[in-house]
């Protein structure tokens, strides 16, 4: 019979304070003078290579209600499958593509990103990852369990 491990407890959730989304997108909340433009507002600039796409969505809670008090970030490779990252060892990153974006969701929980269709990222095994966009959602009250 297996015995439960009492020393592997759930890590307590931690908050980043009441200003997470406000601090990440101060201009959206009329807090001027911090930075000229909120970081991550633009994923692409003129001259970007690849097929332009618009990614839209809506963040809802378990009851189907909109979560308007949140921030959505995306991370992705460029059209050639190259990440704009110091960890990227391949050359040829598109200088007109940031590789990430950040948008606050409106009161309806909706968000939208103008980006490009990501390319396949090569794996060490010789295969490829499917083109994908990674989403990170930050909101008050997100807990484990």
Stretches with model-predicted labels:
Residues 1-145:
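Beta-strand-dominated extracellular/periplasmic modules and repeats
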